C-alpha cells in the first residue's frame, strides 16, 4: 500500500493569537462519504461552540466572485 501526505487544514488569524481565538478561521477539506467539500470554522466567544460554513467545490468560484465584488465596493 502506498501512502501520501495531504494538507487538509489551514489556520488563518492575527499574528500571535491562539488557534482557538474567535478571530481565527480554520479552512478545512472534509468528507462525509459523499465527496469532499470545504469547511470554514471559527470558535465563538463562549469557547464551547463553533460557527461552521460548508461549501461545495463547485460553489466556491461563485462565492469568491461575490466576495471580491463586494470587497471592491467597501469604503
Show which residues each predicted segment covers.
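Positively charged, low-complexity terminal tracts
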Residues: 1-75
Amino acid at each position: 500500500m502506498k501512502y501520501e501526505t495531504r494538507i487538509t487544514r489551514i489556520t488563518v488569524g492575527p499574528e500571535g493569537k491562539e488557534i482557538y481565538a474567535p478571530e481565527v478561521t480554520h479552512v478545512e477539506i472534509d468528507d462525509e462519504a459523499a465527496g469532499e467539500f470545504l469547511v470554514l470554522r471559527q470558535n465563538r466567544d463562549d469557547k464551547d461552540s463553533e460557527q461552521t460554513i460548508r461549501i461545495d467545490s463547485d460553489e466556491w468560484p461563485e462565492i469568491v466572485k461575490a466576495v471580491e465584488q463586494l470587497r471592491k465596493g467597501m469604503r
